[in-house]
């Protein structure tokens, strides 16, 4: 529904209908889970503070980060003049950094703690995302690759930290439903992030046309 906001009247009507339907289904499940003890996602999960905070943090963080794989290749091609293959290879270091960072997470968390890592890394991710705007067509490729590599590593640190703290305080009988709900939340957040990126892109396209 978010992706169609800002389009013509027919698409806007479809977007509003989709959002209204989704909201109604969510409210319906809330009413169901409130009266049934064997619900797939029991509301008691949300009484665990770390789980609740982790879900909200995951959602907000992925809203911005999930749009990067959509928008960054477009920037590299349209604004910087790279070919599609060049743009794809330029952002490959983000995935490489994410994989290389995973084995270091246990040591980092033991050394600095969840609170310090999440506070510092959240600011760092925001700065790295905003500073992409400082680059231009004349920026050296090695500098762009280094920037994207660091951003990929910081993204990995962010999500790994948030995922582990989300499940940290769940009781054994809550682990299955908690893991499942966290996975659903991640998919929703990524979908919202991509839709939000598309919405912003469409808004600026219309502004340029005007």
Task: Describe the residue ranges of each PLM region.
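Hydrophobic core of alpha-helical transmembrane segments in multi-pass integral membrane proteins
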Residues: 16-31
């Amino acid at each position: 529904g978010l992706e169609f906001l800002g389009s013509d009247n027919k698409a806007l009507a479809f977007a509003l209908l989709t959002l209204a339907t989704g909201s109604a289904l969510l409210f319906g499940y809330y009413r169901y889970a409130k009266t049934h003890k064997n619900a797939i996602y029991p509301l008691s999960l949300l009484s665990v503070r770390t789980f609740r905070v982790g879900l909200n943090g995951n959602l907000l963080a992925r809203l911005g980060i999930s749009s990067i794989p959509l928008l960054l290749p477009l920037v590299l091609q349209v604004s910087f003049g790279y070919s599609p293959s060049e743009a794809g290879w330029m952002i490959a270091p983000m995935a490489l950094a994410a994989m290389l960072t995973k084995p270091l997470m246990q040591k980092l968390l033991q050394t600095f703690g969840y609170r310090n890592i999440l506070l510092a890394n959240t600011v760092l991710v925001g700065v790295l995302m905003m500073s992409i705007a400082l680059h231009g067509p004349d920026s050296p490729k090695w500098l762009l690759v280094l920037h994207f590599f660091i951003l990929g590593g910081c993204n990995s640190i962010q999500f790994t930290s948030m995922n582990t703290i989300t499940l940290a305080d769940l009781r054994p009988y809550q682990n299955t439903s908690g893991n499942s709900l966290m996975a659903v939340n991640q998919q929703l957040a990524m979908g919202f992030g991509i839709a939000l990126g598309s919405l912003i892109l469409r808004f600026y396209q219309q502004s340029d046309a005007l």
